[in-house]
Amino acid sequence: MSAVLAPTVRIQRQDFDVAAEIAALTQGRADVGAVVSFSGLCRDEQGALSALELEHYPGMAEAEIGRIAAEAVERWPLQGLTVIHRHGKIRPGENIVLVVAASAHRQAAFEAANFLMDYLKSRAPFWKKEHRTDGSEGGWVEAKETDTQAAKRWKSSSE
């Protein structure tokens, strides 16, 4: 019987190194045949954003993301899973989120990473506030309907 994979979930203020996180997940592993990573960056679409401030309720965010990461491990045959989400003020071009899924085969890794990102974009307990280059504060950013719809494709028939 194989050991149950414990996903790595971190909520942190500091930046992360994508290559280092992938290396940490795959170092010395001969059972991994595919690694899919998604790194989400802070984007400034109109040239007016100085920072995006992400707030979370400590404990709740880790528990919720841990729950969905555990569901990914149950649904797909993964050899490794890392989810990192930052909080605090994040400037355009900086990392916000990282999902790294490792599996023996690519389909499981791709699907698990997609599943996690759809969840993170629509239901993870983070609140985002825009800070503009003119010194003003923008509004709180809501989840997009397209993100909510994307997450619905993963619901099981029992939900």
From Swiss-Prot:
Span list, region Disordered: 130-159
Residues binding substrate, per UniProt: 41-43, 105-106, 121, 128-130
Keywords: Molybdenum cofactor biosynthesis, Transferase
Domain of life of the native organism: Bacteria
EC number: 2.8.1.12
Gene Ontology biological process terms in this record: Mo-molybdopterin cofactor biosynthetic process
A matching Pfam family: MoaE
Pathway the protein takes part in: Cofactor biosynthesis; molybdopterin biosynthesis
GO molecular function, one term: molybdopterin synthase activity
Catalytic activity: 2 [molybdopterin-synthase sulfur-carrier protein]-C-terminal-Gly-aminoethanethioate + cyclic pyranopterin phosphate + H2O = molybdopterin + 2 [molybdopterin-synthase sulfur-carrier protein]-C-terminal Gly-Gly + 2 H(+)
InterPro entries on file: MoaE_sf, Mopterin_biosynth_MoaE
Enzyme type, top EC level: transferase
Its biological purpose: Converts molybdopterin precursor Z into molybdopterin. This requires the incorporation of two sulfur atoms into precursor Z to generate a dithiolene group. The sulfur is provided by MoaD.
Subunit structure as annotated in this protein's UniProt entry: Heterotetramer of 2 MoaD subunits and 2 MoaE subunits. Also stable as homodimer. The enzyme changes between these two forms during catalysis.
Family, per entry: Belongs to the MoaE family.
Official protein name in the record: Molybdopterin synthase catalytic subunit
